[in-house]
């Protein structure tokens, strides 16, 4: 890929966290760095271990390949490779690759002298992953409660985990997370549509300005968050969507153990209508 004209002045030494100048170089448009090397190492090793697991399983169908965690009765012990140990090693590789990628993002931010918003945002995704495969299983006392690495099997795990607690649709944290995901998609669609409409005015008109964009939303809903504000809002919505989605799993089986539909009886038994004749309680 060609080096863009403005990029060369930003390719300066320094800003590394580990390794000094040893890996402080670029390959084409890609910055390497120490954590780029560790990302490649962990990702490659994890991928090869998945292939090994597929060979042990006896299938090369991507939809059927599945690496299962150790059985629940194994607890938090290290398992044999063919009894879930392979899943444990792949989890270490995935965690190492994700964290290395985030730290590589930190080094790039340091080189450019910009804020750490991108690695912070990516770290929220890492937190969600670790919640499912490390934090929640450790709180429940067994790696067997983590999800398997497979297309269909991980979907089965999602379904089974949801129905273990009655119906996850009644999980208030699940409600909040899903609502925020929908809101994030809505905000992104509105923002993207607004920018494209300003950049592609009707024939004969010049490109519109941010003032036009602000005025549109003030006319539409009485307020415009602004060109910078919409990106702050989008980041806030997206981070909260991931955080509360992780929380909906984290509290299930660790803090709350019953059916999520039963959790809502506090609403049914509120004094406003609990004893009302013909009311919600009959």
UniProtKB/Swiss-Prot annotation:
Alphabetized Gene3D superfamilies for the sequence? Photosystem II protein D1-like
Keyword Electron transport present in the record's keywords: the answer is yes
Q: Identify the residues that bind (7R,8Z)-bacteriochlorophyll b.
A: 154, 174
Indicate where this protein is primarily found.
membrane
Localization per record: Cellular chromatophore membrane
An individual GO BP term:
photosynthetic electron transport in photosystem II
Supply one GO CC term from the record.
plasma membrane-derived chromatophore membrane
Residues reported in the UniProt entry to bind Fe cation: 191, 231
Q: How is this protein situated with respect to the membrane? A: Multi-pass membrane protein
Chain segments annotated as transmembrane: 33-56, 85-113, 116-141, 171-200, 226-252
Under the heading PROSITE patterns, the entry gives:
REACTION_CENTER
Q: Any idea what job this protein has?
A: The reaction center is a membrane-bound complex that mediates the initial photochemical event in the electron transfer process of photosynthesis.
Subunit comment:
Reaction center is composed of four bacteriochlorophylls, two bacteriopheophytins, two ubiquinones, one iron, and three highly hydrophobic polypeptide chains (designated L, M, and H).
- State the family named in the UniProt similarity comment for this chain: Belongs to the reaction center PufL/M/PsbA/D family.
- What name does this protein carry? Reaction center protein L chain
**Native organism:** Rhodobacter capsulatus
């Amino acid at each position: 890929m060609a080096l863009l004209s403005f990029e060369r002045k930003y390719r300066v030494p320094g800003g590394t966290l580990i390794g000094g100048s040893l890996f402080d170089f670029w390959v084409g448009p890609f910055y390497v760095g120490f954590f780029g090397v560790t990302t490649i190492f962990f990702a490659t090793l994890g991928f090869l271990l998945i292939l090994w697991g597929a060979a042990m399983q006896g299938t090369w169908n991507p939809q059927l390949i599945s690496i299962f965690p150790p059985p629940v009765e194994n607890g938090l012990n290290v398992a044999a490779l063919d009894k879930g140990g392979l899943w444990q090693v792949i989890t270490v590789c995935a965690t190492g690759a994700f964290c290395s990628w985030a730290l590589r993002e930190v080094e790039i931010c340091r080189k450019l002298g910009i804020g750490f918003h991108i690695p912070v945002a990516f770290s929220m995704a890492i937190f969600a992953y670790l919640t499912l495969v490390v934090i929640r299983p450790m709180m429940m006392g067994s790696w067997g409660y983590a999800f398997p690495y497979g297309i269909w099997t991980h979907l089965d795990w999602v379904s089974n985990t949801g129905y273990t607690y009655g119906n996850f649709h009644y999980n208030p944290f699940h409600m909040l997370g899903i609502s925020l995901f929908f809101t994030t998609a809505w905000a992104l669609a509105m923002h993207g549509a607004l920018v494209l409409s300003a950049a592609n005015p009707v024939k004969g008109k010049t490109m519109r300005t941010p003032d036009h964009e602000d005025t549109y939303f003030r006319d539409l809903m009485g307020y415009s968050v602004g060109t910078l504000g919409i990106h702050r809002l989008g980041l806030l919505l997206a981070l909260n969507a991931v955080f509360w989605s992780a929380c909906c799993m984290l509290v299930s089986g660790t803090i709350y153990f019953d059916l999520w539909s039963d959790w809502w009886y506090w609403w049914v038994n509120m004094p406003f209508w609990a004893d009302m004749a013909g009311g919600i309680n009959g």
